């Protein structure tokens, strides 16, 4: 449980009118710059999971990027973060925390949060490994 709260504390990002950061990585930057920042922070590409893997505040995470479904070439559409968790009620724990931190978005849809003034949206999902955090930037084309 302590691991969960340390991770969530790390994910309480800075709200800014110009950019949204995940672990200090500006998601509104170009894909090339985001990739360089990911490498600089020690995340490495893992072929078996088809994702970057590394430690975020002492917790192993897996990150993948969607740069294909975008409104502007060279920008990031989505950052997908998988957080392995064994707790049966992991999704419930995480959403209760985010309900306190962030405003719900998308007409009050459950598990969808507005996390920045720039239009970045976070959707919290359950996955086979734990939880999945999907950050959709303003450049994401649905």
Locations of regions flagged by a protein language model:
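Short, solvent-exposed mixed-charge patches
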Residues: 140-142
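N-terminal leader/targeting segments
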Residues: 18-71, 82
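Sec-dependent signal peptide recognition
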Residues: 2-8
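N-terminal signal peptide c-region/cleavage motif recognized by signal peptidases
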Residues: 14-16
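Short, hydrophobic/aromatic-rich segments at coil-to-beta transitions
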Residues: 48-53, 108-114
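Short, exposed beta-strand-loop hairpins at the edges of beta-sheets
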Residues: 114-136
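Long, charged/polar, surface-exposed segments that mediate recognition or autoinhibition
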Residues: 20, 61-113
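Residue-level detector of intrinsically disordered terminal segments
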Residues: 10-12
